């Protein structure tokens, strides 16, 4: 054990970073640590955060307090004359006035100014220098600084020296509550975005994911203004040909698993843009679910959780081994790590125009085909719909699937109306001859208890056939209800599962279930119909 005098000298040495002035942001704290290394942030976290520790695998373990997930009902966007007509107002983008924003901003600054030291991280959002956003994060917790060190694109020494003024600033005062009596506040949590000021204010939540999604929300506003499609998806590229593809899908559809392909480079796992020059990742890292993680289920993620990574809200055993099955704190345990920790990652995280765009859905009704080819109109319709379904709990012997519709497969982060993103997708599809596919990773031959889950082996074979071009030449037949072209053959996939009605023993039950699902699609689309073109409306299922 080191003598206490040596420990004191060592700990004081990590405080001796060059002062950084944040007075332009209204902050007067004398000690500001800018872009500390992971090693230094580890030491700060262990010293200054009560519950921080180092896991056996080397990752920093931190806890976000009472909030262990996003707080979408507490997100506000300033209603400003310059942008109010652009924004899709409603439960996703709840308006607040400029005065309320300034009250919350000042409250955050007042709190941050009471801290003995602050952490500042300057980095980039977007791997294409032509479109990247300079982001500054100001926070009071080393855990938050390390998290954004992993999630933003880390500048070189030269880039940091010439960084200049940021284009977007996050003030994370999440340890301090919002005043719930302030106009429009629903709780002591507030995540306020001003598009005009290019600032995000966080109060009353220490969940790190709010910062990541704040950056994505800003990208979702500014990218379409430049003719760039921002997307909530993963992206990969063939190691030999460089041909890229996009994978969209909500939670539980297999997006993460299917993106891990030894034949392909990972461009990114969550947030991307499609410009006139190709695709690029917005982020410099990955933020993966850690629940029930094993080296067998997700080997890439498991090995990436090491020194330099952050493990959030996990439970450790006495020897600091991580118990990924323990959900005592939350089901939403997470791990954040730099993308270069993935062996198959392509750096820089850019690629050419995608050859294929894949929408994943886990259809628990057992109605949708394992794979279908979509026209531009059908692609826009299903992109706006963003459908998947989960198996509900069984009560009195009845299992009823629960549908989820999330527009553009990323509803909580959209700023414009979903049709804006759908039109950009169709435009880029047509311009760059991208094929679009709907892949069902859910059930066939019936729903749960009657049919069978489509095997991962068969889904991987479908994805392989999409990527190698063979599925584009396969025979198809039009689905009488949904109207898209169902692939009737696919290499290494049994033909009997490809046409869903044929896979059901009870044809009448299939027809009734297909009609029911079509009705759910149509009811959901009523929300978007007013802004949709006649072409997109015509792509709706026929009941």
Label the predicted regions.
Residues 502, 509, 513-543:
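Generic C-terminus detector
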Residues 270:
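A cross-family detector of function-defining hotspots
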Residues 88, 194-199, 402-408:
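Gly-rich Lys/Arg/Thr-decorated short loops/hinges at beta-loop-alpha junctions or inter-strand turns
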Residues 183-222:
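Charged, amphipathic alpha-helical linker segments immediately N-terminal to NTP-binding catalytic cores
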Residues 163-184, 208:
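Carboxylate/His-rich catalytic cores and anion/metal-binding grooves
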Residues 17-59, 66, 224, 232-250, ...:
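Glycine-rich, often acidic-flanked micro-motifs
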Residues 10-161:
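N-terminal accessory targeting/assembly segments
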Residues 255:
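Conserved lysine of the Walker
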